[in-house]
Amino acid sequence: MQQEEDDYFQSEEFLDILGRYEQAASSGHTPYMDSDELVDVADYYMSQGKHQEATEATRLALELHPDAQDPVTMMADILFETQQWKDSILWLNRVLDNDPFDVQAWLNLADAQIQCDQFAEALDSAEYTLAIQPDNLHALLQKAYATSRQDRYQEASEIFAQYIERCPDDELALYHAAFNLCFLERFHEANDMLTRAEELSQGLSPEHLNICLQRSYTEARIGHMQEALDALERSKEFQDPYTKVDYNLLSGHVYLLFQHRDKALECFTKALANAEDHLHTMRTIAQVFMDCQDFLTASDILREIEEMAQRPEYEDTRAEAIKAICPAQAYCYYQTGHKDEFLHYLQMAIALNPKDTQIFFRDIFPKEARVEDYLYYANGLE
């Protein structure tokens, strides 16, 4: 297919089309050309990495031939290839309005929706692809990932298993499947997957850094301190200034899991020194202490975040910071037995962040309870 396209772009027929288009464009005239000719020109420019020129040719095709479908598909492809995710979603939906059986459009739509954190919509798109092509592995992986990102970890683990059974050497799938298993506290299985993923990657996978970092965490959770530190060490050569923050946070997490508090605090201090977003980094540190069952320290950090958010320099991010910490702070006070504070923050959490509130408390309150009724159940707790 690629060779055929390359041959066409070298043909006299296409070179004549391209020449007419570029001659008119260079003289400031609008060339009147057929829709398929303009789409071919745009396709050629895309193959040369000339995205702006491809966009201009496609816009002209849309202007001259508003009822033609090929320019709509080309515009969707350009926006997708240039990672303009939100705009690509709009154009991909236009493609699918015309042809609801376009598998590639459904696949691209799901990928774009995942990039925009539209996981419920991405799951729907993946399901449409699978309805058309039940054996489409890309769609199966999209389904697994979108399901996991909606906190449906058990269901996602089963879908990941279906995919890995058919593609056992896909290190990206192994990484995401292992990450999902960590939420189910199936750390031995996750560690086995990450070990395999690292072997397959050999430093070449785009997720190699994350594979090493996540493996460090799973090694620590199964009691392998040295292996955890070794995995962290292997990650160093793949780091940039941003990921050094993640490295120090995870190093601190590992040390804290093995009760080396002083070393953990040193790592957290380094992370904060390099962090661009201090409130977010502090919130991550609080989550680490929660993961290690130190709810008193986590609560102190969350309280410090709340106080810092009142400073003038955090005016633009204050509301988002308070929204993010309320469910976690309510959970910490629940765990430490501070009922008045627990009820206060639970009420705030229900109002500001019901989604995360449900995640924190779904195993504490009745499963059938609505989030807005949590305060009623909380008042009945001893």
Residue positions per predicted region:
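Start-of-helix register in tetratricopeptide repeats
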Residues: D36, D70, Q104, H138, ...
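Canonical positions in the second alpha-helix
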Residues: A61, R94-V95, Y128-T129, Q162-Y163, ...
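Short coil turns that delineate tetratricopeptide repeat
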Residues: P66, P100, P134, P168, ...
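Canonical tetratricopeptide repeat
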Residues: M74, N108, Q142, H176, ...
